[in-house]
From Swiss-Prot:
Substrate binds at residues 8, 30, 57-66, 114, 176, 185, 205-206. It catalyses: orotidine 5'-phosphate + H(+) = UMP + CO2. It comes from Oceanobacillus iheyensis (strain DSM 14371 / CIP 107618 / JCM 11309 / KCTC 3954 / HTE831). This is Orotidine 5'-phosphate decarboxylase. One of its GO terms (molecular function) is orotidine-5'-phosphate decarboxylase activity. Belongs to the OMP decarboxylase family. Type 1 subfamily. Pathway: Pyrimidine metabolism; UMP biosynthesis via de novo pathway; UMP from orotate: step 2/2. SMART domains: OMPdecase. It comes from the Bacteria.
Amino acid sequence: MTMFVALDFPDWKQTEAFLYKNELQGVPVKVGMELFYKEGPSVIEKLKRNNHSIFLDLKLHDIPNTVHRAMKNIASLGVDLVTIHTLGGSEMIAQAKRGLEHSQTKLIAVTLLTSVDEEVVQHQLRLPGNIPANVAHLASLAKANGADGVVSSVHEVASIKKTCDTSFLTLTPGIRFDSSDVHDQKRVATPEMANQVGSDFIVVGRAITQSDHPYTAYMEAKKRWEEASDE
């Protein structure tokens, strides 16, 4: 069980100020597109020097050979987790895993973004079936082609574990202290909800980064995440 703090900042200066002025050195962190595309691999090196576990959330989605070569470079960074899109297909997923074969980095596949609702699935993407059915299918595709796990809202974790095996990892973003606080993610949850359905990892962003007291918010989220199973 690991809780990642989403470093949704535009540059290293703001990231550094947030982490180290708030006594958050060494906490597991998520680096997304905004920060990585601004700072490049150097941000990973800086975070590793300060003993952070790192979830690199780039959601790669390209032709298989391009993703394979990108993953070989990502493998050299030594991050703990990295994401791709399952909608790139079986060969892309397999080539992504192949690019990581000499590293300890785990491959996590995105099924449907947590910002997507049934309206988008049915009328914009025109995918057959509802969200749970599509997520289960894409999770099975990811597992069959070597992925270590998938990104999943709390609503799909149980079905993924049932379909793919309990050892198949699930990472749940969109964690809030109040499940009605949705912002731009439609399928959100609290730390307790994620624990109770069996999520292996969670990502907490605004609830910590926009708090007046980030360290206190971090400790509260961590406590709620870790202790929910004891209730």
